[in-house]
């Protein structure tokens, strides 16, 4: 399942902050990583970086949010828009592929294909609503990639759909904008940076493992990004928008890392 909505109060500030610094340190190449960790793995180091007085749980929580924002910057800085995630042979596909959402399998949203329209708005020149037939008529590509969940598990699947960079160019999106946001039929929402949106493996997925995308995996479409953790891959997409205003996200607004790189 997704991370729990109500997180426990942080009681051991030193330990949690050290873990947070280690997470950030993963994204910094040696030798800079050593210097970062040596200078930062104390409450005083965090105070210098965030400007917070670390004296109680509330301050620790605020500091961790500041660290998450810092982590976003580090991940964005290190993200290579041309570096491909690993591709796997079809013999390694996980069958059945796991279902995962913030609700149970028996609560999967059913979307009517005939009436479905993908709404496109924001900094785009073509704002017409797309039918499923129009979307399926666009050139499709396959990828066999690994889905990595923030909870620690992973699974390999075969996803087919429209390269998102192709779609963004087709609708005349402002490719210099900062964000692309998504709204979904299950009330989920999230957003990504433009560099990830233009990554060659970011895909508007319409099919899974040779069949129309099943409802449990996000019919009528999901966004597949092997460069992001699972919670950044929205399902049941109904609307997308291009913007320079930070859109947030369902889990991100509850404290989870916004960049969410895998």
Curated annotation (Swiss-Prot):
InterPro entries attached to this UniProt entry: OxRdtase_Mopterin-bd_dom, OxRdtase_Mopterin-bd_sf
Q: What does the record say about induction? A: Part of the SigF regulon, induced by chlorite under positive control of SigF. Part of the probable yedZ1-yedY1-mrpX operon.
- Specify the domain of life of the species encoding this protein: Bacteria
Q: Does the keyword Isomerase apply?
A: no
- Transmembrane recorded as keyword: no
Q: Which UniProt keywords apply?
A: Stress response
Q: When the coding gene is removed by deletion, what phenotypic consequences does the entry describe?
A: Growth somewhat inhibited by chlorite.
Q: What does this protein do?
A: Part of the YedY1-YedZ1 system that may repair oxidized proteins containing methionine sulfoxide residues (Met-O).
**Family membership noted in the UniProt record:** Belongs to the MsrP family.
UniProt-listed PANTHER family: BLL0505 PROTEIN (PTHR43032:SF2), PROTEIN-METHIONINE-SULFOXIDE REDUCTASE (PTHR43032)
Q: What is this protein called?
A: Putative protein-methionine-sulfoxide reductase subunit YedZ1
